[in-house]
Curated annotation (Swiss-Prot):
Coiled coil: 92-270
UniProt protein name: Kazrin-A
Family: Belongs to the kazrin family.
Top-level taxon of origin: Eukaryota
PANTHER family registered for this protein in UniProt: KAZRIN-A, KAZRIN-RELATED
Signal peptide annotation: none
SMART domains: SAM
Chain intervals with Low complexity compositional bias: 52-62
Bias-annotated ranges (Polar residues): 742-758
Originating species: Danio rerio
Domain SAM: start-end pairs: 457-522, 535-599, 623-686
Length: 786
């Protein structure tokens, strides 16, 4: 609408300009005509009577006002004047026309007078005739021009009327437009008024919802607390139940062994009496030696039974279902009870063989002294066997923790204990014993890998170390085919690790290389680094949860990131291999690694410091993400505390990162920027908490100086260019890992594998001599297991 009005106004302006231009042209033509008429007036004869001219002039002067008044009257009757300027132009134009008409009439009168004079004189000069004919021609032309001017003036009047009508329409349209705009403004004011009212109602509703949300949050946290307490209580009850079950199974095992021993003793009583009767006269009726010999023999038989079949009994007892009576005493099922005769067969072989030997022998060696000596020898053999089986039992217990973690208990099939006595068959028993021996050998190899230098390892030890300690069973086949000893493992380069063992993962290669270098440094008498105690399960689960980034646990599991490999990670490694793309998360992980470096990767020191500040707002550098969430709740910001679950904010970030301020924490907590009081409260609390910790950290860092450098020749120099990144990262972080002899004092040999600590027997000599040489002194019992 506005555009059409603008176009119409422009068109009206253009028409008015054209009309003005036409009027100007007419004025110019009239002026030229006036000049020509003046020239013609000068050509009149001087003999013309003056009275006649004066009369004509007076008549013209008298007629001019009358004609002018008529023209004005006509102009007033033709219609309303559009504007003052247009009316003035019109009046002037009419005045010009009237003046021209007067001049034309004067010229006509002059022409008539000249014609009369010519007629009176009866002829005239040819020159005068020529001039009169020219004047006639010119007069005719002027009349034609005047007609054309009249036509143009009439056309202009028509255009003015048309423009006046268009202007009237435009004014009407503008009035309609103004009316429409007023109605729209009224509607807009109504809409704004309604919107304000609706906004106020929405704000009131939001406040009500916020209060309800706070109530729900409180109820949720109460439920969470109750759930946590119930879970802890259930865990305590479960652990107590497990302890009771284990105790019940031990009592069942003792009951079963007692029954077996009783059956064995009942079976062998007549034979023992037959052996003991002839000796009474020799010792002058004193039977005390026989009783003293029989009691140790019975105990030895019992111990031998327990040692020989402890592993099978444990499997049966763990698998067999238990039925509890009303008094809470767990009883063995009948199916499990049928296996007891099988266990007593070999136990009675010794006594039967000894009795038969005593009956067949009639030599003087059948005396009580000789029999006592033979029984003592048998006791020594039994004691030696008991010690050996005890070690086996302890090894099997540890091995079950290594290879059986996480497996659910399965009840044994009742058909295993049917009358066919399938479990006690020699083939099944031999298979079970062979598996136990294989597991025992693997356990011995793992213990040897933990205690002996790498250069003394054999192929089995290398394979057990790679599978159990390094958690790389996928490379076992290539290792068994190509690596036959620890010496071969020590000389492998990074290229050999990729070609010989088939390790294509650069992170796995780096992990294996760091472990080999750690063992190489340990052979120098400094022991393994503390980072060796941190396996990849601890890093991927416990440590990532502590730093508040559990979402990357799967990537750390995939690349088997342990303590040594963790100490070498850079920003590029985090982004390329572990898919940590956010800069804030990268800084969080790197600062967590820096904290571990300051603690020399000692997990015990870290846990002790965290336990000391668990209920106190001190030492925030070692705080976990959960501890920070607890602190946020303590300062009355619990509605924002859950936003830190996967944010990567932990104590090392708060203390070690100078750019971490209250605004950063507020952003991590998702506190709105318009809540200035909440942000100010958080700033004051953080300032009180972090300032003292940063000041103490600066005082600790000042006397440390630069870390020692490592000048030892490494076997990495012969690696291929494809493993250049692993070499550079290894050289860059060996100081941080603690492989330098200057930083390897007072280190512990023991490692924490993924299944926990294995029991060690016979390592007292190593623990006593650890200060002088922690890996080169071993007892004979340890070296004979190789």
């Amino acid at each position: 609408m506005m555009e059409e009005n603008k176009q119409l106004a422009q068109r009206i302006d253009g028409a008015i300009q054209c009309a003005k231009q036409d009027v100007a042209n007419l004025r110019a033509e009239l002026t030229a005509t006036g000049h020509r008429l003046a020239e013609l007036g000068e050509l009149e004869e001087p003999g013309e009577p003056q009275e006649h001219q004066q009369q004509q002039q007076q008549q013209n002067h008298q007629d001019a006002p009358v004609q002018r008044q008529k023209a004005l009257t006509e102009l007033g009757q033709k219609g309303d004047v559009a504007s003052q300027e247009t009316s003035l132009d019109k009046v002037l134009l009419h005045e010009e026309v009237l003046r021209l008409q007067e001049e034309v009439s004067v010229l006509k009168q002059v022409r008539e007078m000249l014609n009369r004079e010519l007629e009176e004189t009866g002829g005239g000069c040819s020159v005068e005739l020529m001039s009169v004919s020219q004047l006639r021609v010119q007069l005719t032309q002027k009349e034609q021009e005047l007609d054309r001017a009249k036509e143009a003036l009439q056309a202009m009047k028509t255009d003015r009327k048309r423009l006046r009508l268009e202007r009237t329409d435009l004014v009407n349209q503008m009035q309609q437009l103004y009316t429409t705009l007023e109605s729209r403004e009224e509607q807009l004011r109504d809409f704004i008024r309604n919107y304000e009212q609706h906004r106020k109602e929405s704000e009131d509703a939001v406040r009500v919802l916020a209060r309800e949300k706070d109530l729900l949050e409180r109820e949720k946290w109460d439920l969470r607390r109750q759930t946590k307490e119930a879970t802890e209580h259930a865990g305590a009850l479960r652990s107590a139940l497990d302890l009771k079950e284990s105790r019940i199974k031990e009592l069942e095992a003792e009951l079963t062994m007692a029954k077996q021993s009783l059956a064995t003793l009942t079976k062998d009583v007549p034979k023992r009496h037959s052996l003991a009767m002839p000796t009474e006269t020799v010792v002058n009726g004193n039977q005390e030696w026989a009783m003293h010999a029989e009691l140790p023999l019975t105990a030895a038989i019992r111990q031998s039974q327990q040692n020989l079949y402890h592993s099978i009994d444990r499997q049966v007892l763990k698998a067999s279902p238990c039925v509890c009576d009303g008094d809470g005493i767990s009883m063995m099922s009948s199916a499990a009870a049928r296996i007891s005769p099988c266990h007593s067969k070999q136990a009675s072989v010794m006594s039967d063989a000894s009795v038969m030997e005593g009956e067949r022998s009639s030599t003087p060696s059948d005396s009580p002294r000789h029999r006592t000596h033979s029984l003592c020898n048998s006791l020594e053999d039994l004691e030696e066997q008991r010690r050996r089986k005890k070690k086996e039992r302890m090894g099997l217990g540890s091995l079950s923790r290594v290879f059986g973690r996480g497996k659910q208990r399965k009840s044994m099939d009742p058909t295993l204990f049917d009358d066919s006595d399938s479990l006690s068959s020699p083939a099944r028993l031999s298979v079970s014993l062979s598996e136990c021996e294989e597991q025992l050998d693997r356990l011995q190899q793992v213990e040897l890998a933990r205690s002996a230098p790498m250069c003394r390892w054999r192929a089995g030890t290398v394979q057990a170390w790679l599978e159990v300690i390094m958690a790389m069973p996928m490379y076992m086949r290539a290792c068994a085919d190509n690596v036959k000893s620890g010496k071969v493992l020590l000389v492998l380069t990074d290229e050999d690790l990729g070609n010989v063992l088939g390790i294509s993962n650069s992170m796995h290669r780096r992990k294996l290389r760091l472990a080999i270098e750690d063992y190489r440094d340990a052979e120098a008498g400094h022991g393994l680094s503390k980072a060796a105690e941190l396996d990849h399960h601890w890093v991927a689960q416990a440590w990532l949860t502590d730093v508040g980034l559990p979402q990357y646990s799967q990537f750390f599991h995939t690349h088997l990131v342990d303590g040594r490999l963790l100490s070498t990670l850079t920003r590029a490694d985090l982004e390329k291999h572990l898919h940590v793309s956010k800069k804030a998360h990268q800084n969080s992980l790197l600062l967590g690694i820096q904290l571990l470096h300051t603690l020399n990767f000692d997990k015990e020191i870290l846990q002790s410091r965290r336990s000391e500040c668990e209920n106190q707002n001190t030492d925030p550098a070692v705080w976990t993400c959960q501890r920070i969430i607890k602190w946020i709740k303590e300062i009355d910001l619990k509605e924002f505390a859950d936003n830190l679950q996967t944010s990567g904010v932990h104590g090392a970030v708060m203390v070690l990162d100078p750019s971490f301020r209250s605004d950063t924490m507020a952003t991590a907590l998702c506190i709105p920027s318009n809540k200035h009081m909440v942000r100010h409260h958080l700033s004051e609390e953080m300032k009180a908490l972090v300032s003292a910790a940063r000041a103490g950290l600066e005082q600790e860092v000042e006397p440390l100086g630069t870390p020692p450098t490592l000048h030892r020749q490494s076997s990495l120099s012969s690696s291929s260019p494809s493993c250049h990144d692993d070499q550079q990262s290894l050289r860059r972080v060996k100081q941080q890992l603690g492989l330098s002899p200057k930083n390897l004092t007072a280190r512990n040999i023991s490692h924490q594998s993924r299944s926990g600590s294995f029991p060690r027997n016979g390592l007292q000599e190593v623990s006593l001599q650890r200060e002088r040489c922690p890996v080169r002194h071993f007892s004979a019992a340890e070296l004979t297991n190789v």
